[in-house]
Amino acid sequence: MSFVLKLIEEGEHLNQDFKLRIDDSRKIAKTMSGFANTDGGRLLIGVKDNGNVAGCNVSEEYHMIEAASNMYCRPAINFDIQVWKVGHLSVLEVKILKSNSRPHFVEGVNDNGVTKWDA
């Protein structure tokens, strides 16, 4: 069994989250900052919540992760990327280590349209 399939077999937990795809860079920035502000974690993109591999467009998903870090996180969050193949499908692993630059904040907008920063 490949390494990525072993990770998927673990299921989602405190330090691992499955994402079918990234639709909102600001939303994923919150997950990334949560990992960086605590013990670190891993995103597996192209994996459904039930653990089934659906695959992803690696370049699109990388762009969304990069945008999340650079546009919405202060300070920006460092991450490592690994692309895994499961048959003909690609799974993008995004590893976020516990940060030495904590706390990280995520830019948001409150109900009144005012910019706010969440840790």
Model-flagged regions — what are they?
Residues M1-A119:
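Conserved N-terminal catalytic/coupling substructures associated with nucleotide/phosphate chemistry
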